[in-house]
Design a protein with these regions (language model features):
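Alpha/beta-hydrolase superfamily serine-hydrolase fold, recognizing
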Residues: 1-211
Length: 211
């Protein structure tokens, strides 16, 4: 979210590059992922011009952007390039997971199950939504070894809460998972959940800098 990127940049402690990746349904998988991987490679390749340290690249995103951040870290082209991930309520399964949170918060909590289904089908396009490059939570433990140290911030009242929790458990000790129990989906993007937003800025900043 642009407002979160602005807040991170305003800290004065890091450079922030916001990727304007192509969106579904006009540009289904893998177009958006390709754009993200291209951007990471660009940042590393042009680190001198951007005045950044290529050894300290963090990649982050919320919801579908969190999915793209994870998929970028898993891609062959980005192996070894990303020092850390910062994820907010990421999509890790691009299909109805029928978990408790999916059923309990599937309507009226910022992201409805019906809308999520439309988004998932639009992004997957002609590709199987269970494909590990789309549903990153389906990756096996060997593939997940590519995941760097990660901060995963969850919304407790969110349709995606349980799939994020399951993903964190699969990755293991490299993930720090923090949950705001009363928050709903999109709390870093849509104004109105100021406490969760403010604490997330601090959490993300500290996590990125305290390597």
């Amino acid at each position: 979210g642009g407002r979160f990127c602005d807040a991170m940049a305003a800290s004065g402690k890091m450079k922030v590059l916001a990727v304007d990746y192509r969106l579904a349904p006009e540009h289904p998988f893998p177009k958006g992922l390709d754009d993200c991987v291209d951007a990471i490679e660009y940042a590393v390749r042009n680190s001198n011009r951007l005045n950044i340290d290529p050894a300290h690249i963090s990649v982050g995103g919320d919801s579908s952007g969190g999915n793209l951040a994870i998929a970028s870290a898993l891609s062959d082209r980005c192996v070894g390039m990303i020092e850390s991930l910062v994820l907010f309520y990421p999509v890790t399964k691009a299909f109805a997971d029928n978990s408790l949170s999916w059923k309990k918060y599937g309507e009226g909590y910022g992201l409805d199950a019906e809308i999520m289904d439309v988004f998932n089908r639009a992004y997957a396009g002609d590709v199987d939504p269970y494909d590990e490059r789309i549903s990153v939570g389906m990756c096996d433990s060997k593939m997940l070894e590519r995941i760097p140290r990660t901060l995963l911030v969850a919304a407790g009242r969110d349709i995606l809460c349980d799939q994020g929790k399951e993903f964190a458990a699969k990755v293991g000790s490299r993930i720090m998972r923090i949950e705001f129990p009363d928050a709903v989906h999109l709390f870093i993007t849509v104004p109105g959940q100021d406490k969760a937003f403010g604490e997330s800025v601090s959490l993300a900043t500290d996590f990125i800098l305290n390597r």
